Amino acid sequence: MKVATVALALGIVASGFSRTQVPIPTYTKDIAPLIADRCGMCHDVGGAAPFGLLTYADVKRHATQIVTVTRNRYMPPWKADPSNGPFVGQHPLTSAEIDLIRRWVDGGTVEGDPRDLPAPRHWTDGWRLGPPDLIVTLPQPYTLQAEGTDVFRIFVIPLPVSRTRFVRGLEFRPGNPKVVHHANIRVDTTAASRALDDADQGPGYNGLILRSADYPEGHFLGWTPGQVAPLLPKDLTWRLDPKTDLVVEAHMQPSGKKESVQPSIGLYFSDTPPTRTPAMLRLGRQTIDIPAGEKQYTVTDSYVLPVDVEVEALQPHAHYRAREVQGEATLPDGTKRLLIHIADWDFRWQHVFQYESPLRLPKGTTVSMRWVYDNSADNPRNPQRPPVRAQWGQRSSDEMGDLWMQVLTRNEPDLVTLTRQFRAKVAVEDVNGYELEIEKHPDDTGLHDSAALLYLEVGRPEGAVAHFQKALALKGGSAPAHYNLGTALSVAGRLDEAVSEYRQAIQIDGGYANAHNNLGGVLLAQGKTGEAVREFRDAVRLQPQSASGLANLAWVLATAPQAADRHANEAVDLAMRVVDLTARRDARALDVLGAAYASAGQFDRAQEAASTALRLAPAEPLAAEIRRRQDLYRQGRPYVAPDPASRR
């Protein structure tokens, strides 16, 4: 009986433990911290979300919806595989946290003790990064129509900057987060984007971002709901010069009524110039051509790194038909590293994935990407019903498939090597893309101009001539159109025709400094040194801070075939101005200075200038030419340019 009594007692104890209740979660202690940390960036006053989650009443009102969207992992939006990274701001809920929210709702959405609430966040006038040093706003609001498909509008915002600044951070405020879904931001140091904006009746313009508008010195600039890039380290700032415009491509979705959109941008400055410059690598194909109904169309691309790099950030980009993206690195020893995988791509949730700590990849690593598209009626995001053929293009109704990578190299020579080699790869792909765009829009002069510049970049000047001729015919004979055609003709070796085009540009616009400068170059190649010098002097007179004009004039005064045309002391003065303008970081400028010093008999200084130029690792054939000239300086001999007349 004693044994039975003990067994019964143990049974009672065991039964008691089995009935212990797990505490019911409360809002103040368990749910409010989760909401603030994972949802607060969007579900805040003026945030991108359609409603706020700032109070117990807010969260209780949407409690059932929160359970649903967290359980299916639709919210908070984080499309990348959780095993990727770790990335800055990586904030998917864990399974335990999702279950905690469910238990709170099942338990009656208990509020709890107010003393358990986390301290509220306080933004400075809505700026997450603190008070900006400069705030710019679209001068006039844009009116988004009530109905219709998504709208992509390009806004140009001039920057009131009177001196060179260095930027540590940029924060974008959409102005109307209910309808602005994401934005890509670039900088344009020319007036080209502004001219398109001015030509349009309303704020901004429709179409494509020009090639003159680009990301600054290897930095991503953009905005998606809930994402604010942290301030950059002081050694990674980017340069902002006067007369620069911000070019904002905004993706907007009609709400059912007319909406006013007036975005603002806050800039954060530093007095410290960068000591390191990132590179932007873009994997992708511009030959995309997806048949209607195709469910498994695949696009791949890869690149072998010529130098060691540290990967700072990734950004996949595609449109509505894309369903999956994968980025991978294969190390020289064959080891594979998954960079990013998004199994359910959604164009509406683009994101820059910035590593918490840079990912090191050694020289010889192959970086690759793979996109999968579904152009069938089964794809709920397909913008065409019924599906139609989809080709590469920058409009949202077209398709794209890129994986951008921001990387840092170990030193400046490695950066030069990487950017030079990778740019050659990208330019060939860009030619394909622009030819596709021109097929669809044959009368777009901007497309013809951009395609022509790409043909020049890949060493196919006759292709450039054809596109510039078409642009000239469309523009009706403007000075820039004649100038562009003259440039392509000169590269193609058609010098007499080039001279004619440059002279027509100058006749239309006598103050066209670049036309005078390029005309001088062609005349010099024809052996007409005196005429060339006159054109170079006109170019410098019209644009005294033009490094190109100063360098060309200094070069001919230092190296002219005939001694009577050489003026060494003036050449030295001009070359020193060029070197100062380029902060001693331009190998060609230093080469000109070396030639000028040698012409003046200062051979030690000439050798030093050549050595400094070579340390910048210039591309061939410039590097070989500098070495040959340096050998002359060691022998106490100046460099004298060959006389074109002697080669005829």
Locate each region found by the language model.
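Structural signature of tandem alpha-helical TPR/SEL1-like repeats
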Residues: K425-N432, E457-K470, G477-P480, S490-Q504, ...
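Canonical positions in the second alpha-helix
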Residues: E437, K470-A471, Q504-A505, D538-A539, ...
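Terminal, low-structured helical/coil segments at or just beyond the last alpha-helical repeat
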Residues: Q562-N569, R577-D580, R584-A587, S599-A600, ...
